[in-house]
């Protein structure tokens, strides 16, 4: 593929890792961020020690403080900013863009208040001629592994499969491989909702429970993710793929996962405000829990794990008691995930 100019919006761990993948493939990569010291560090020392202590980035990766400079004559834009600021950044991008580009995002969450998926936010904010070609990049991936070029397989989802194949082409190489999918709703809901289940799995670990309990919360968590996703219009088969069960396994079992670590700390009795302060990173599963709970209540979707975590985080219920209470819920058929 011809060399592309790509703006990566967000110099966090995942944005930095994806920037390196694109750079390895010979593309011109421009990272944009709003922390001056971090941008200077990337340009001058070729490091991003806020997230990676021992990683040296390629000198060809450039970082920008001015969004207009990062966007100048690019072929594609990759949003990797926290969910809560995606709309704000998209508005800024829309004001500055003077040509058509491919718009991608690699964040996982649901917007508080509106309950919207990130591609919907982008559709509402970017120029109309680009709205049908938004691509979601999502799947089982720890930035800590991708940055050292461990094998990673994820999904590129778009209503327009030709654009999804373009994204597949700019990212794929010997250690990083993308598969295409047209089910944007399924891929996005899987990526957002698995963070809630990861909090639950981490909490079980923090409370001292073993593998049986963790396997139960992950598999039953997948059932309620699917239940809500299908209600929203997703294809249930998507949840058996990379962006579904694959991402849930990675996030729900690993110490690399900030959502799992947050749950682990909650399970050990730490206060949420202390956990967020100590981590110094966005824990998307916390805000997504509230959004998912509200959607489930509105649509009448049975989500017991999400409800238990919501009650412990937002209503002050004891997390151990909330989780154990699920054991006394009505007995159900495993195969009737789409029914109450």
Curated annotation (Swiss-Prot):
Active-site residue numbers: 194
Give the Enzyme Commission number. Answer: 1.1.1.94
Q: Which reaction does it catalyse?
A: sn-glycerol 3-phosphate + NAD(+) = dihydroxyacetone phosphate + NADH + H(+); sn-glycerol 3-phosphate + NADP(+) = dihydroxyacetone phosphate + NADPH + H(+)
List localization entries: Cytoplasm
GO molecular function term, any single one? NAD binding
Q: Which domain of life is it from?
A: Bacteria
Residues reported to bind NADPH: 13-14, 108, 143, 258, 282, 284
Q: Does the keyword NAD apply?
A: yes
**Which parts of the sequence bind sn-glycerol 3-phosphate?**
108, 139, 141, 194, 247, 257-259
The UniProt keywords, alphabetically, are: Cytoplasm, Lipid biosynthesis, Lipid metabolism, NAD, NADP, Nucleotide-binding, Oxidoreductase, Phospholipid biosynthesis, Phospholipid metabolism
Give the enzyme class: oxidoreductase
Indicate where this protein is primarily found. Answer: cytoplasm
User: Which BP terms from GO are recorded?
Assistant: carbohydrate metabolic process; glycerol-3-phosphate biosynthetic process; glycerol-3-phosphate catabolic process; glycerophospholipid metabolic process; phospholipid biosynthetic process
Gene3D superfamilies from the UniProt entry = N-(1-d-carboxylethyl)-l-norvaline Dehydrogenase, domain 2 (1.10.1040.10), NAD(P)-binding Rossmann-like Domain (3.40.50.720)
| Pfam families reported for this sequence | NAD_Gly3P_dh_C (PF07479), NAD_Gly3P_dh_N (PF01210)
Gene Ontology cellular component annotations, sorted alphabetically: cytosol
> Annotated pathway, please?
Membrane lipid metabolism; glycerophospholipid metabolism
What InterPro entries does UniProt report for this protein, alphabetically? 6-PGluconate_DH-like_C_sf, 6PGD_dom2, G3P_DH_NAD-dep, G3P_DH_NAD-dep_C, G3P_DH_NAD-dep_N, NAD(P)-bd_dom_sf
Q: What does this protein do?
A: Catalyzes the reduction of the glycolytic intermediate dihydroxyacetone phosphate (DHAP) to sn-glycerol 3-phosphate (G3P), the key precursor for phospholipid synthesis.
Q: Which family does it belong to?
A: Belongs to the NAD-dependent glycerol-3-phosphate dehydrogenase family.
**What is the protein's name according to its record?**
Glycerol-3-phosphate dehydrogenase [NAD(P)+]
Q: Which organism is it from?
A: Streptococcus thermophilus (strain ATCC BAA-250 / LMG 18311)
